[in-house]
């Protein structure tokens, strides 16, 4: 037999032998981590104070609530969590669309074109129409609520004449009827920076306008895939309807959005031209957040996940950022977005967001990359203690920005720590 064959066998046996030692060492690190307990306690402290996104926001946002509802379940009774979800259903649009967030009607005044509903007179709603993730976020939130509390009675609750179960499907129908592109078989939205809600063509950028350049991206479609999986688990009798849709979106994400040569997702498929200069090569940009959500949607193989985290680590090194929560690398150049906050490495254009970095950590743990997850978790939990809070985002120099009680960050880090503790428990039982 070939000598290389025996070398390969020996290497494989060595890897198998070292795995228990590696796991044992990691378990010790998890159990003695100097930041985990502080972060857990701080997360519970922050989430007790309410449901708005953070101290810089008056609204309860569904894309945020989706990432801390499980944490909220630790400190609030079921009916409180359920009531927040019911507000979104009572304010559902006549076409099935879901609002971004709601605020007490008497406090409405933040520049939005507010939405009102006879079913929910207490609140004013708003919707950033450049996004295509509100409906998916609500389905995921209801799923997490049921998983966390065991209370599936919410599915039979009524908002007006429709049950929650009916409204969940209606929200998915909205996406297929109003945000689905037939040519590519994928959902569309405005051009934004990865998962962001700011388009380049407007000073604020949260609404579709006559200048909008419509595009397809991985984040919106990966969120939809996760929502469809959740919906079919909540409503198994509807699986026959939604399974083919899920399969179509999954296949088309791989076909049209995955760049096999460069082992990354392309930023956008443009439906009516790009808002950026003709000589700009947008595919040089690597989207961290959309990639993390795509992994959650099951779109990448183990080898592709490994390549993804290696690329993210390299991007952090090249940019000088603090963590793999870096939204993208490189960022869009100066002046590409009319919103002045979207300067290179500013806000969603290359800011460092634990809110998405924490989701990548979760997926690394779930996909057997616990060692890498632990390594990349450290800067995120360290800065919580260093800054005594969960900040919305960080500059490339690791300086905290935005809300200091950003509940989405608290939620994803808390959940990641739960997964590390589960990993330790399961390995101790082996």
Question: For the regions a protein language model found, what residue spans apply to each?
Answer:
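Long, repeat-rich segments with strong aromatic
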Residues: 248-253, 298-306, 315, 319, ...
């Amino acid at each position: 037999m070939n000598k290389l064959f025996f070398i390969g066998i020996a290497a494989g046996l060595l890897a198998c032998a070292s795995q228990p030692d590696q796991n044992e060492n990691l378990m010790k690190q998890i159990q003695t981590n100097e930041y985990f307990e502080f972060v857990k306690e701080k997360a519970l402290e922050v989430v007790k104070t309410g449901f708005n996104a953070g101290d810089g926001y008056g609204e309860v946002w569904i894309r945020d609530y989706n990432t801390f509802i499980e944490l909220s379940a630790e400190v609030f009774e079921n009916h409180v969590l359920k009531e927040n979800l019911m507000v979104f259903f009572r304010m559902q649009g006549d076409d099935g669309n879901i609002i971004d967030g709601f605020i007490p009607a008497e406090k409405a005044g933040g520049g939005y074109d507010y939405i009102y509903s006879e079913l929910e007179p207490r609140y004013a709603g708003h919707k950033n129409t450049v996004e295509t993730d509100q409906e998916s976020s609500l389905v995921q939130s209801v799923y997490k609520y049921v998983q966390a509390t065991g209370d599936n009675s919410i599915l039979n609750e009524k908002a007006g004449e429709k049950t929650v179960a009916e409204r969940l499907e209606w929200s998915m129908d909205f996406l297929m009827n109003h945000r689905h592109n037939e040519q590519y078989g994928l959902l569309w939205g405005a051009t934004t920076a990865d998962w962001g809600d700011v388009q380049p063509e407007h000073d604020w950028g949260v609404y579709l306008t006559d200048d909008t350049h419509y595009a397809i991206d991985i984040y919106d479609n990966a969120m939809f895939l996760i929502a469809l999986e959740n919906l079919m688990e909540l409503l198994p009798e509807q699986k026959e309807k939604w399974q083919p849709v899920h399969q179509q979106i999954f296949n088309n994400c791989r076909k049209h959005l995955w760049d096999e040569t460069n082992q990354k997702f392309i930023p956008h498929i443009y439906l009516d031209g790009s808002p950026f200069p003709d000589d700009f090569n947008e595919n040089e940009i690597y989207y961290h957040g959309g990639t993390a959500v795509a992994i959650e949607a099951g779109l990448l193989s183990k080898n592709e996940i490994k390549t993804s985290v290696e690329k993210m680590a390299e991007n952090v090194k090249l940019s000088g950022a603090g963590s793999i929560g870096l939204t993208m690398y490189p960022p869009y150049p100066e002046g590409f977005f009319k919103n002045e906050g979207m300067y290179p490495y500013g806000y969603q254009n290359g800011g460092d967001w634990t809110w998405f970095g924490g989701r990548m950590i979760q997926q690394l743990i779930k996909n057997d990359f616990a060692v890498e997850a632990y390594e990349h978790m450290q800067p995120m939990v360290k800065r919580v203690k260093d800054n005594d809070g969960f900040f919305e985002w960080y500059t490339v120099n690791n300086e905290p920005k935005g809300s200091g009680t950003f509940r989405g960050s608290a939620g994803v880090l808390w959940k990641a720590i739960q997964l590390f503790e589960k990993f330790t428990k399961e390995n101790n039982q082996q």
